[in-house]
A protein has these predicted regions:
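Conserved beta-strand edge residues that scaffold enzyme active sites
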Residues: 79-80, 123-124, 193, 200-201
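N-terminal capping/small domains of soluble enzymes
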Residues: 2-123, 130-132, 163, 175, ...
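Short, function-defining helix-loop hinge/capping sites that tune catalysis or transport
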Residues: 84, 127, 203-205
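Non-globular sequence segments
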Residues: 121-191
Length: 207
């Protein structure tokens, strides 16, 4: 019995007895994922050139998970604007020039059978914090060390972090556009899905 026949048999069994297997495929809005084991987005803070570009580390990290059998691989928090990064070492999709660095990762992970998604994020008042390569863990990074002026819905700071500048209405609309543009870049690169990060106290959950 071929692998496809085995999958079809499992799916038929799930339909008849009301149970679903962990390794059964599932379809969401026309997108079929090969199983129900997914790699969640977990930030590695490894864009060490501080340019938002993925590196050979990211290739190994994500493609090996795809080869290992994950049904969906969701790439870590990826900033829609440079000032929206959680740290200077975060990935980004805020510019067309970043797209080519992603293509080989996505293409090879999909060739290994995984469905590829990316989590888009803007950290708002929790941006510009430290990462392992530059220090300042749980602190705001000084501008001379690669940090930047952070923004938020108000000028209220988060804990010990620097005070943000309150966003204007026009800036809020511009950030909405940033999410849209990053999503279109992800689509053009070949990602199958986009996840909007609206938790953990980042910008969307700050309003």
């Amino acid at each position: 019995m071929s692998e496809d026949e085995k999958k079809a048999k499992r799916s038929k069994k799930a339909t008849t007895n009301g149970t679903v297997g962990l390794f059964d495929p599932m379809t969401l809005r026309g997108m079929t994922v090969r199983n129900r084991i997914w790699l969640p987005p977990m930030d590695t803070y490894s864009a060490l050139a501080q340019d938002g570009l993925p590196t050979p580390f990211h290739y190994q990290h994500y493609v090996s998970r795809a080869m290992g059998g994950f049904g969906m691989v969701i790439v870590e928090a990826t900033a829609v604007a440079p000032e929206g990064r959680i740290s200077p070492c975060d990935l980004g999709l805020w510019a067309d020039e970043q797209m080519d660095a992603w293509r080989w990762i996505v293409a090879d992970a999909k060739a290994a059978g995984a469905t590829m998604a990316v989590q888009l994020n803007h950290a708002g008042r929790k941006a510009s914090t430290g990462c392992f390569s530059i220090g300042y863990e749980h602190e705001s990074v000084p501008e001379e060390q690669g940090g930047w002026q952070i923004v938020g819905p108000s000028a209220n700071a988060f804990g010990p972090l620097d005070k943000p500048r309150e966003l204007t209405v026009d800036e809020i609309h511009a950030i909405v556009d940033r999410f849209r543009d990053a999503a279109w870049r992800a689509y053009d690169i070949g990602f199958d899905a986009v996840e909007i990060h609206a938790a953990h106290g980042y910008l969307l959950s700050q309003f």
